[in-house]
C-alpha cells in the first residue's frame, strides 16, 4: 500500500471546541508542525506570542474568511490566497472582524530536527496556558 494519508478537515481531532484541529498528528507528519486554527467573528483572545523559546518560524495562510495578523506593531490583512511568514522573534496575534477565519499554520525550526509538542498529539489534553500554546504548530 502507498504511504499516503487522506482525510477531510472534520476527521481530524478537534480541541478548544473545534478552534484547533490536530492536522499534523492526524496525517502522521513528523518533519514540521501543522494545525488548522478556526476563530469566530470579532475574536480578540488569540494569544499574542513569539517563538524565541524554540526558534520556530511559522507560515500562515487563510483557507476561508478573513483576519488581521498583528506583527511588530503592524496590521496585515489576510484572506484566501495570501501567505505570510513570521520569524521566531516577532510577536504575532490574530484578530477577526465581522467574519470568522480558518487558518492553516505551518511551523519548523530552520536547520533542526522537528520535535512535536506533546499537546499536539492526538488524544493529548489541549494547552492549559499561554506558555504551552506558544508552540502551537
What are these regions (language model features)?
Residues 25, 46-53, 71, 95-96:
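Short histidine-centered beta-strand/loop micro-motifs
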Residues 73-88:
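Short acidic-glycine-tyrosine-enriched beta hairpin
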Residues 55-67:
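Glycine- and acidic-residue-biased ligand/ion/polar-headgroup-sensing regions
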Amino acid at each position: 500500500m502507498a504511504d499516503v494519508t487522506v482525510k477531510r478537515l472534520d476527521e481530524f481531532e478537534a480541541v478548544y471546541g473545534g478552534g484547533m484541529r490536530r492536522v499534523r498528528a492526524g496525517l502522521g507528519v513528523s518533519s514540521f508542525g501543522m494545525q488548522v486554527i478556526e476563530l469566530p467573528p470579532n475574536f480578540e483572545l488569540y494569544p499574542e506570542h513569539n517563538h524565541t523559546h524554540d526558534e520556530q518560524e511559522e507560515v500562515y495562510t487563510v483557507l476561508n474568511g478573513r483576519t488581521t495578523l498583528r506583527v511588530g506593531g503592524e496590521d496585515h490583512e489576510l484572506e484566501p490566497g495570501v501567505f505570510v511568514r513570521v520569524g521566531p522573534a516577532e510577536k504575532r496575534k490574530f484578530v477577526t472582524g465581522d467574519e470568522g477565519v480558518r487558518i492553516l499554520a505551518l511551523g519548523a525550526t530552520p536547520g533542526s530536527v522537528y520535535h512535536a509538542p506533546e499537546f499536539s498529539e492526538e488524544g493529548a489534553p489541549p494547552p492549559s496556558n499561554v506558555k504551552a500554546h506558544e508552540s502551537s504548530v
